């Protein structure tokens, strides 16, 4: 009989749930807001309620609960070690212990960007690759690094926090983490919107910017290319450290092949030494909203 796992993807505004089989297929899905009352209800309380409602009487026997979670996750203990977002009461939450006591099942917890990468490695655009840098572009920048077929986690499972290496340390923009010049302040889609508005463009969001760029607006294209260059410079440094086969771009903007992925690939190759460019691929993630669920389950399977 096929094994089934419960994947739980806890984000800043919603929790996604999915029954995932042993081949990485999502059999059933659900989603619930975690910010519906301004976080007055603790996030993990909302998650537990969502799980109980999701696991109906006819649900299959589960091997365990695999959690992908926003924030700096101590994956060794399954605890939230830190966060740069405005999530009241999230730091210090024992996700693993709480869910194991509540549901009587083994639980693993990993960072959401790491899970995105693992999902793509198991069942998506990075399948078959052993050395991959995964970057998720959104309101911030998340990242994961696969080297020699293994996820780079570090001593406490906190490794791969790509959004907070210092791209412009001396004269950069202040970051929510308290530092200056962090990568996500230049590479996130919010940075693109900020740059467009600073240039006097009508740019309420990233979608509007890409629509204007697709229409050939020269000022918008100049802002977009500047943003792509910032992303590329950060990736170039990572390429020289990790020598990946593949750079994987996730987030909603990754669907912009002609306006983002193709020019980004070209700019990265121009910014690195020739030996590192040989065979290097840059492509969009494939699993979209399922990546965190699938990757969390893959992480669970690896820990057993």
Q: What role is predicted for each listed range?
A:
Residues 127-186:
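Glycine-rich phosphate-binding loop of actin/hexokinase-like ATP-binding domains
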Residues 9, 66-70, 110, 134-140, ...:
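Short beta-strand segments
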């Amino acid at each position: 009989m096929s094994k089934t796992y419960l994947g739980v993807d806890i984000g800043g505004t919603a929790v996604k749930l999915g029954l995932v089989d042993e081949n990485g297929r999502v059999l059933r899905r659900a989603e619930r807001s975690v910010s519906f009352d301004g976080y007055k209800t603790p996030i993990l309380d909302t998650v537990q309620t969502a799980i109980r409602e999701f696991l109906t009487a006819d649900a299959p026997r589960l091997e365990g609960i695999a959690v992908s979670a926003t924030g700096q996750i101590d994956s060794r203990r399954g605890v939230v070690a830190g966060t740069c977002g405005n999530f009241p009461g999230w730091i210090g939450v024992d996700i693993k212990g709480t869910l194991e006591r509540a549901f009587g099942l083994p639980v693993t917890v990993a960072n959401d960007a790491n899970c995105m990468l693992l999902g793509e490695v198991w069942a998506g655009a990075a399948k078959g690759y052993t050395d991959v840098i995964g970057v998720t572009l959104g309101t911030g920048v998340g990242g994961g690094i696969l080297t020699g077929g293994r996820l780079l986690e570090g001593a406490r499972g906190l490794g791969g926090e790509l959004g907070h290496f210092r791209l412009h340390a001396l004269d950069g923009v202040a970051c929510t983490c308290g530092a200056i010049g962090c990568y996500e302040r230049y590479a996130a889609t919010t940075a693109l919107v900020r740059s467009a508005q600073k240039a006097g463009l009508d740019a309420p969001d990233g979608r509007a910017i890409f629509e204007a760029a697709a229409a050939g607006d020269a000022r918008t294209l100049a802002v977009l290319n500047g943003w792509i260059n910032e992303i590329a410079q950060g990736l170039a440094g990572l390429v020289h450290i990790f020598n990946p086969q593949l750079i994987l771009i996730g987030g909603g903007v990754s669907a912009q092949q002609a306006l983002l992925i193709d020019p980004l690939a070209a700019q990265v190759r121009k910014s690195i030494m020739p030996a590192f460019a040989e065979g290097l691929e840059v492509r969009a993630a494939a699993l979209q909203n399922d990546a965190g669920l699938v990757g969390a389950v893959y992480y669970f399977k690896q820990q057993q």
